[in-house]
Amino acid sequence: MTASTVALALFVASILGHCWVTANSTGVASSTERSSPSTAGLSARPSPGPTSVTTPGFYDVACSADSFSPSLSSFSSVWALINALLVVVATFFYLVYLCFFKFVDEVVHA
């Protein structure tokens, strides 16, 4: 098994793992899990419309995107670290086995 095959296998495993985590962590309820409220015993009166609609202004909305800090308490951050480690290890093996040994062979044969 060559180093490029190992690197490709690690890459595919990383992608499949990410897709599995993304598919299982959507948190969206399916249509079978939703329940409709029961209307038994309620009169059919129309509900009053909204009295006033207030839209938030530009400065009323808070955003904390610039204060992101990684946390090791979530599964996704641990999974991202594992993926990064796999990429670093695969890159190391790729460089050592393909580039370095080709360089040594060229120097020895020249």
Curated annotation (Swiss-Prot):
GO terms for cellular component: host cell Golgi apparatus; host cell membrane; membrane; viral envelope; virion membrane. Its main location: virion. It comes from the Viruses. The keyword Iron does not apply. Belongs to the herpesviridae glycoprotein N family. Envelope glycoprotein necessary for proper maturation of gM and modulation of its membrane fusion activity. Also plays a critical role in virion morphogenesis. This is Envelope glycoprotein N. It comes from Human herpesvirus 8 type P (isolate GK18) (HHV-8).
